[in-house]
Regions:
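Gly/Ser/Thr-rich active-site cleft segment
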Residues: 11-13, 124-245, 311, 315-316, ...
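Phosphate/pyrophosphate-binding loops at sites that engage ATP/ADP/AMP, CoA/4′-phosphopantetheine
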Residues: 56-75, 148-155, 201-211, 390-402
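Glycine/Thr-rich phosphate-binding loops that ligate phosphate moieties of nucleotide
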Residues: 1-32, 39, 75-116, 150, ...
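N-terminal phosphate-binding loop and adjacent alpha-helix
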Residues: 31-71, 116
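ATP-dependent carbohydrate kinase catalytic cores
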Residues: 185-295, 305-309, 314, 322-325, ...
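Short glycine/proline- and acidic residue-enriched helix-loop micro-motifs
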Residues: 45, 121-132, 296, 470
């Protein structure tokens, strides 16, 4: 039987999917499963490793059934995953010691007073605490140890393994035979601060972790092992593994220095290909984008907050919309925001130069005239403004960007794309394939299979629509300035 398909496992934040691509990199079938968010306390956002693995296997079986395919028709598996999310588990039993601590978790803030006077910490990470993201392992793990002191002994035990979601899934899918991580997931993981390769070993040293607790780092198009035949009845090779934002950067064809994309999903992330350069400051961070044949390409990244999370909240928690299909019409049923602005700090404020994990979201400018349409419009505008703010910071540090490739579920909004174009003054090109993270993982597996080369990725880039600045540009730029003022006010309140 011909092996003509690639299966991609896309481990997202709120759901996971199994997706089937053909040799033309066309998405044919998919199966999606929701993932429960576990919030034990304020600022804590976890997920169950066992639920994620079990639902991954369910999705893999479902997508084959949906497509009427057999496992022996799958040439390879590719994986892409949310980043900065980690767990500990036992090598002997394969059972987790902890839940996954997600990239949205902010418990790390509670550890900062402890480490501010910690001699060993300040020796290993001099003047770096303020640059540590909320998902930093050292800060989060210390807080966990306050409640579970036994974890300090667990990480010293040679039976204990650490991994991000890709490491866990590959470990389980291969029956424990492959303990690996991609260079992109490794470098955007919780062990790094400034991106220096020795930082993860410093973090391990701080807690006396045993030397084999960290997974082997591989290229993105590499051999990650074989699927346990007990799962689908076939030993399918796992040939691609790439972190989600880097995956969409690749599949959008951003393979040349200076190419920029924004992915708007649960969160909004801006990435720019910077070749072999490396730059990190308080607004943006450099990461490995991908490694092929041992050669790494780097990207600079700016986080633009919780895009999809805000819209899910608007729908599910406060009932501004009944379904997302009506969102655009409702927001545009009013001519402007009537002076209402939304500060999108529903899980802290993380937006380039605005990094205040303890901040809380708010509406500003409410009056007796304010309607729910204004509230919804202000939320959608805040998503565009947050992304524009990242490009502001990139311009300040010297990046000359001409156009923005945009993808992800939130990019389906014409209003958000147009607002982004107006505020930045740049052409915004929306991808026809809004599932670019899965596509990038399929392309990495295809490269390992010999079906394509890196430069062939440009053959699979399709645009849906281009947005250029229109007659509302001046108004939108003024509203952007007002929004930044409100964000600054809220951040200052919670910095105190």
């Amino acid at each position: 039987m011909n092996k003509e398909y690639i299966m991609v496992i896309d481990e997202g934040t709120t759901s996971l999917r199994a997706v089937i691509f053909n040799k033309k990199m066309e998405l044919l079938f998919q199966s999606q499963k929701p993932i429960e968010m576990i919030c034990p306390a304020d600022g804590e956002v976890e997920q169950s490793p066992l639920e994620i693995y079990e639902k991954t296997v369910e999705a893999m079986k479902d997508v084959l059934e949906t497509g009427g395919l057999k496992a022996e028709q799958i040439a390879a598996i590719g994986i892409t995953n949310q980043r900065g999310t980690w767990a500990l588990w036992s090598k002997k039993t394969g059972m987790p010691y902890t839940n996954f601590i997600t990239w949205m978790d902010t418990r790390s803030e509670r550890s900062k007073p402890y480490f501010s006077t910690h001699e060993k910490f300040n020796e290993l990470f001099p003047d770096q605490m303020d640059m540590m993201p909320p998902w930093n392992f050292v800060l989060s793990f210390q807080q966990m140890c306050e409640e579970r002191p036994e974890l300090l002994e667990i990480v010293k035990d040679s039976d204990t393994l650490y991994g991000t979601i890709d490491t866990w899934i590959i470990y389980k899918l291969t029956g424990g035979r492959s303990f690996t991580i991609s260079s992109s997931s490794d470098h955007t993981g919780p062990f790094y601060v400034l991106g220096n390769m020795d930082e993860k070993y410093k973090s391990a040293e701080l807690f006396g972790m045993h030397q084999d607790i960290l997974p082997q780092v591989l290229d993105e198009a590499d051999d990650y092992g074989r699927l346990d035949p007990d799962i689908l009845g076939e030993e399918i090779p796992i040939f691609g593994n790439i972190a989600d934002q880097q995956s969409s950067l690749f599949s959008q064809g951003c393979i040349n220095t200076g190419d920029a994309k924004c992915t708007c999903g649960t969160g909004a992330f801006v990435n720019v290909n910077i070749g072999d350069k490396f730059l990190t400051n308080h607004s943006v961070t450099s990461y490995i984008a991908w490694t092929l044949d041992g050669q790494s390409v780097n990207c600079i990244e700016g986080v633009a907050g919780n895009a999809g999370t805000c819209l899910e909240w608007a729908k599910g928690q406060i009932g501004l919309i009944e379904d997302f299909s009506s969102m655009e019409d409702i927001a545009q049923s009013v001519s402007d925001n009537d002076g209402v602005y939304f500060v999108p700090a529903l899980a802290g404020m993380e937006c380039a130069n605005y990094l205040v994990p303890s901040a809380k979201g708010s509406f500003q400018g409410l009056t007796v005239r304010t309607k729910k349409e204004h509230l919804l419009r202000s939320i959608m505008e805040a998503i565009a403004f947050a992304i524009a703010n990242v490009f502001d910071q990139l311009e300040i540090i010297g990046f000359d960007i001409e156009k923005i490739y945009i993808d992800g579920g939130v990019s389906k909004s014409n209003m958000i794309c147009q607002k982004l174009s107006n505020v930045t003054g740049l052409t915004v090109i929306r991808s026809k394939n809004t599932e670019s993270t899965a596509l990038g993982a399929a392309e990495m597996a295809a490269i390992k299979l010999g079906w394509m080369k890196e430069e062939d990725v440009l053959n699979y880039v399709e645009s849906d629509r281009e947005f250029i600045p229109d007659e509302n540009r001046q108004r939108d730029k003024e509203e952007f300035e007002h929004w930044k003022q409100y964000v600054e006010v809220i951040c200052n309140i919670y910095r105190q």
